[in-house]
């Protein structure tokens, strides 16, 4: 049993070789990338999927400046669209990674308003359907051990190594975050 995001057709729920559901704005909190209510419009863009340690499926909707760009699906099937002020103007997201403690790191490929790409970090504190206790942070600049700014303009990928360090692939080379769980505070 698994889910597949698509760049136009929404979210698919699959078991074996059988498609159980296709989620679109008609049956889930997704929105179309542009204003077109036609059911044949191929503009429901769901990407950046990851599971957290509680079994919640997190997804980012891209393209078209979606007001509620994050969607979570809890293990019981409840889905909710979520927004944070720092990502309301994001036009395209990259990969998302959930740390073992539940903190999520989401790459920003294109921010329309100011052009600042970077990493959005958020922690739902174990209450994915309630944002009142959430912590979040947008990071567009990193600093190395000597205090020198790493002037990355593009962020490509994320990986967690066996020691718990987070690696971010950028146009300026790799960035290593030694303690990513505490980076949000």
Question: Which sequence ranges carry the predicted segments?
Answer:
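Carboxylate-rich, polar loop motifs that coordinate divalent cations or form catalytic acidic clusters
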Residues: 1-185
